[in-house]
């Protein structure tokens, strides 16, 4: 029996509430500052895992104490998850990073049945939690004190622009009848829970978005992982497990002509997916993230009810906000179309800000309306898409692994990975001239850190871990030689 580790974190509210600050999510006008303090239940001297399977946070919001329970989202990545980028001469470089010990969690607030949470613990705490109907983002503050975090409400983030943002799918008003019919169906509690379904997701990042983030592969990877974690959390009430199967970044050029007309781009992307992407690895649904400004304030487009179709199980989404959550809502919205959902009708669905609203809101909900659930249930009943019946397997891969599994193999001096890595040549897996290392807690700018440099702060009664000066690895329990 595997024991679940329970970790308690106390978040002490800083003595003041900030009035305005620029965060990764944008300019926030009102926020609270909190300090995570970790208290581990591990026995004295035990090795601390990098990311625990389960955690518990205690903190205050608006003066009220809450308890946040988190569990690692163990199904977030497929077993053969891969990342692809391209060399300047056009060669495809595919890596298979180890993602088992990842840092993405989902959870809930104690004694709040409607609460949810989606948190990244990669570098501090970043994500959101829903408490008493309100959604609160949390993210680290870039201060000298690295433990400081901000908690705020989405409506306190200044708008990035005043133009309305909307889905480009044209409402099929004749489909209102299907809502009525679906709504008239009596669903037992068992049916309302929805059968378990699994969607293997492929994310493609176009060249415009790649350059938008300074051609920084790691930054894009982190952003996409956070998006998929959020999508997974939003789909949980439908009993859908989202698994990221592959990330393909067009680092040198676009492989289709990304046009201002979103449906045209979706058609081109669907053709490319059928011809190229599906031959690399099997997956159920693919989305293209782009920095292209679509016409008519469109931020996303997808085919309705075409999940599992080799050409039409696709969507195109503009990376329209600095807020990861807002883009993730759009991606979930377009996924909803592929699962048979139409836009919410204001008169019938009683939810102006739910996921399938045609226009995105500053107070965007992370919930599917009853109408969306009826559409989805009808789609499952009538179409019964086969590709989402089974959990992802290793046999879903149809290509040969290349490199980049975060382990050094025979002939490798460093693990092939991001093309912008200044220390490791991604094409040869060799250290670049003058480099001692490519990654590790004791590696800084391709050189070993000095002996006795702290690389991991003490926890409990354990001493600080310090670098040896001879390796990029950070030894445990203060053994630095």
Curated annotation (Swiss-Prot):
Residues annotated to bind an L-amino acid tripeptide: 296-299, 357
Compartment(s): Secreted
Domain of life assignment: Eukaryota
Disulfide cysteine pairs (residue numbers): 308-387, 349-371, 351-354, 414-429, 416-424, 423-446, 437-443, 442-467, 455-474
Modifications after synthesis and translation: The N-terminus is blocked.
Keyword Transcription regulation: no
Record GO biological process: proteolysis
Keywords, comma-separated and alphabetical: Cell adhesion impairing toxin, Disulfide bond, Fibrinogenolytic toxin, Fibrinolytic toxin, Hemorrhagic toxin, Hemostasis impairing toxin, Hydrolase, Metal-binding, Metalloprotease, Platelet aggregation inhibiting toxin, Protease, Pyrrolidone carboxylic acid, Secreted, Signal, Toxin, Zinc, Zymogen
Main location: secreted
Domain Disintegrin: 400-481
Active-site residues (renumbered): 334
Maturation propeptide residues: 21-189, 393-410
GO molecular function, one term: toxin activity
Pyrrolidone carboxylic acid (Glu) sites (modified residues): 190
Other observations noted: This disintegrin is 100% identical to the disintegrin of AC E9NW27, another disintegrin of the P-II subfamily of Protobothrops mucrosquamatus.
Subunit and interaction comment: Monomer.
Protein name: Zinc metalloproteinase/disintegrin
Species in which this protein is naturally found: Protobothrops mucrosquamatus
């Amino acid at each position: 029996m595997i024991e679940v580790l329970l970790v308690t974190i106390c978040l002490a509210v800083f003595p003041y509430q900030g009035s305005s600050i620029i965060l990764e999510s944008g300019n926030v006008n009102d926020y609270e500052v909190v300090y995570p303090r970790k208290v581990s239940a591990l026995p004295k001297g035990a090795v601390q895992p990098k990311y625990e399977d389960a955690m518990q946070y205690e903190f205050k919001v608006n003066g009220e104490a809450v308890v946040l329970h988190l569990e690692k989202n163990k199904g977030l990545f497929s077993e053969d998850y891969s990342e692809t980028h391209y060399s300047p001469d056009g060669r495809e470089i595919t890596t298979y990073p180890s993602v088992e010990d990842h840092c993405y969690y989902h959870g809930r607030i104690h004694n709040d049945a409607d609460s949810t949470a989606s948190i990244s613990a990669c570098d501090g705490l970043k994500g959101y939690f829903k408490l008493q109907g309100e959604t609160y983002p949390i993210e680290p503050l870039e201060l000298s004190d690295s433990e400081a975090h901000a908690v705020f409400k989405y409506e306190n983030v200044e708008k990035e622009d005043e133009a309305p943002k909307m889905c480009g799918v044209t409402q099929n008003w004749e489909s209102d009848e299907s809502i009525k019919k679906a709504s008239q169906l009596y669903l037992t509690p068992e049916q309302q829970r929805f059968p378990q379904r699994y969607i293997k997701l492929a994310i493609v990042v176009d060249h415009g978005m790649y350059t938008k983030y300074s051609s920084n592969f790691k930054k894009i990877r982190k952003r996409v992982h956070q998006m998929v974690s959020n999508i997974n959390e939003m789909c949980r009430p439908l009993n859908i497990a989202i698994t990221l199967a592959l990330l393909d970044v067009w680092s040198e050029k676009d492989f289709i002509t990304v046009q201002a007309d979103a449906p045209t781009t979706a058609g081109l992307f669907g053709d490319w997916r059928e011809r190229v992407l599906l031959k690399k690895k099997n997956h159920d649904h693919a989305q293209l993230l782009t920095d292209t400004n679509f016409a008519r304030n469109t931020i996303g487009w997808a085919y309705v009810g075409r999940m599992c179709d080799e050409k039409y199980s696709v969507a195109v989404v503009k990376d329209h906000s600095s807020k990861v959550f807002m883009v993730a809502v759009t991606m979930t919205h377009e996924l909803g179309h592929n699962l048979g959902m139409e836009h919410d009708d204001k008169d019938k669905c009683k939810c102006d800000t739910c996921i399938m609203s045609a226009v995105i809101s500053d107070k965007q909900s992370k919930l599917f309306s009853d109408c969306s659930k009826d559409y989805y249930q009808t789609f499952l009943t009538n179409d019964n898409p086969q590709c989402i019946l089974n959990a992802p397997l290793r046999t879903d891969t149809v290509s040969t692994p290349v490199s980049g599994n975060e382990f050094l193999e025979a002939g490798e001096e460093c693990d092939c990975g991001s093309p912008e890595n200044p220390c490791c040549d991604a094409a040869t897996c060799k250290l670049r001239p003058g480099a001692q290392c490519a990654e590790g807690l004791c590696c800084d700018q391709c050189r070993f850190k000095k002996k006795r440099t702290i690389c991991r702060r003490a926890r409990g009664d354990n001493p600080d871990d310090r670098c040896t000066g001879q390796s990029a690895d950070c030894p445990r329990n203060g053994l630095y030689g």
